[in-house]
């Protein structure tokens, strides 16, 4: 049984999307559905296909932003888990399998954030999940730091929605992403509500 749907929001990112899908074709765990929500692209993005994956492309007439796109994807999804994946990411071969293993380790886990590495500086972190400070501010964990410092799992306040897995039933309880956040900070808002 397919347990996870990967939802990729896209806006005029044809080349990025093609590369992202190629990395998904190399996943060791292929038990996923792929859903691309295109936000009214004019660059031919809706012509992108996969050679080996079943992929559904939903072409929206206008740009609804990150939240609008992923909310539609979450509404269309019937799998227990959903991975939200930015089109400019490159997933390592164990990505899907490791995220599934982590979220299935406890029914109390709502989301899991992978160790996100900078695209052009592979020795540096891009994001290791969001944390919450004593001052009441949320911040990205590990940005610009050496990746070796972030090899152990830890509790985080919220997962970066650019590459995280979520337990879909929790969204049904707390609501989807707030579309007032066209792009950015939507994942922190979900962390507050979860």
Language model feature labels by segment:
Residues 60-77, 87, 98:
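Glycine-rich, basic loop-to-helix element that forms the pyrophosphate-binding segment
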Residues 2-5, 33, 189:
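Cell-envelope/extracellular polymer assembly enzymes that use nucleotide-activated donors
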Residues 157-194:
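A short, conserved alpha-helix in the catalytic core of glycosyltransferases
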Residues 90-133:
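Conserved donor NDP-sugar-binding/catalytic core segment of glycosyltransferases
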Residues 114, 133-156:
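Short, flexible, basic/aromatic active-site loop/helix in glycosyltransferases
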Residues 82:
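Short aromatic/hydrophobic "clamp" motif used to bind/position activated sugar donors
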Residues 22-31:
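Short, acidic, metal-binding catalytic loop of nucleotide-sugar glycosyltransferases
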Residues 23, 38-47, 62:
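A conserved acidic beta->alpha catalytic loop
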């Amino acid at each position: 049984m397919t347990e996870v749907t990967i939802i990729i929001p896209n806006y005029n990112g044809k080349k990025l999307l093609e590369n992202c899908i190629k990395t998904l074709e190399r996943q060791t765990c292929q038990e996923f559905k792929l859903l691309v929500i295109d936000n009214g692209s004019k660059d031919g993005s809706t012509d992108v296909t996969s050679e080996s994956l079943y992929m559904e492309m939903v072409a929206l007439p206008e740009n609804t932003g990150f939240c609008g796109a992923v909310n539609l994807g979450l509404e269309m999804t019937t799998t227990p888990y959903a991975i939200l994946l930015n089109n400019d990411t490159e997933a390592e071969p164990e990505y899907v399998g490791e995220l599934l293993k982590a979220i299935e380790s406890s029914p109390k886990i709502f989301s899991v954030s992978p160790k996100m590495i900078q695209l052009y500086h592979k020795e540096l972190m891009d994001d290791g999940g969001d944390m919450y400070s004593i001052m009441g501010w949320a911040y990205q964990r590990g940005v610009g730091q050496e990746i070796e410092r972030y090899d152990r799992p830890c509790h985080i306040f919220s997962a970066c929605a650019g590459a995280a897995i979520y337990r879909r039933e929790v969204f049904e309880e707390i609501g989807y992403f707030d579309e007032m956040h066209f792009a950015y900070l939507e994942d922190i808002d979900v962390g507050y509500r979860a």
